[in-house]
Regions:
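N-terminal type II signal-anchor transmembrane helix
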Residues: 5-47
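Serine/threonine-rich low-complexity intrinsically disordered regions
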Residues: 13-19, 51, 120, 206, ...
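A transmembrane-helix-recognition feature enriched in membrane-embedded lipid enzymes
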Residues: 188-218
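Extracytoplasmic/luminal low-complexity segments enriched in Pro/Gly and acidic/polar residues
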Residues: 222-225
């Protein structure tokens, strides 16, 4: 006995009904996830957890012809302040991205800036090979093991620190996050883009996305701060 058109139509209607509910549930879960990530990023960016440690590590940002960009400048000023307060005896500058005109690296420019602002040469470790946040964390973990550090203050943009904290935890690092000072009024579109970048980057990290194109974009190798 064949299936009647009415029964077939009923089954299709039921399938469509459940598909719609599935889509709604997935959208709600996705919205909930990104709302949680957003809140965590904001919370981390608004709290300075700096306390006495073995070292201060500053994550790299763009440099122009051997001079720190405004973002890197602000990060380095934060490091100088922490060092002058006696928070740690050693500073680690991270970042191997180099300027093709000057040949300088982010870490090298950071070291030069710190030297010019009173941090002794023998108190600075410049890591000049890493190209993205994850590589910088891995390099920092190697330095931590080699130097027998136990606690490290990590300095970067406030919105960057939530992801850094997760990467450091995975690398076995005990860190205190410390955001740089704001640069002033940021364009709403630029601020939204930065937040979206970090939300997607954190999500990709939690999902262990390793597709090269996605990873390069999310890690910001193709653009400078």
């Amino acid at each position: 006995m064949g299936t009647t058109p009415t029964i077939v139509k009923s089954r299709r209607s039921t399938s469509v009904h459940w598909m719609r509910w599935l889509v709604v549930v997935l959208l709600l879960l996705t919205a909930g996830w990104f709302a949680w990530v957003y809140r965590q990023i904001v919370a981390t960016s608004n709290i300075d957890n700096a306390q006495p440690a073995d070292a201060i590590a500053v994550f790299g940002a763009a440099e122009y012809a051997g001079r720190p960009s405004p973002v890197l400048h602000a990060r380095l000023d934060k490091v100088v302040s922490l060092y002058d307060e006696g928070m740690a005896p050693v500073v680690v500058t991270l970042g191997g991205g180099s300027d093709k005109d000057s040949g300088k690296t982010e870490a090298g420019v950071g070291r030069d800036y710190l030297l010019a602002n009173g941090v002794p040469f023998d108190r600075i470790i410049a890591e000049t090979k890493s190209l993205d946040t994850e590589e910088q964390v891995n390099s920092l973990a190697n330095i931590e093991e080699r130097k027998n550090f136990h606690h490290i203050i990590v300095v970067s943009d406030g919105t960057h620190l939530f992801r850094i904290a997760l990467l450091c935890k995975r690398a076995g690092l005990n860190v205190y996050t410390s955001p740089r000072a704001p640069l002033g009024r940021i364009d709403d579109i630029d601020a939204a883009e930065r937040m979206m970048h970090e939300m997607l980057s954190y999500t990709a990290l939690r999902m262990d996305l390793r597709a090269s194109g996605i990873r390069l974009w999310l890690e910001g190798r193709s653009s400078k701060s």
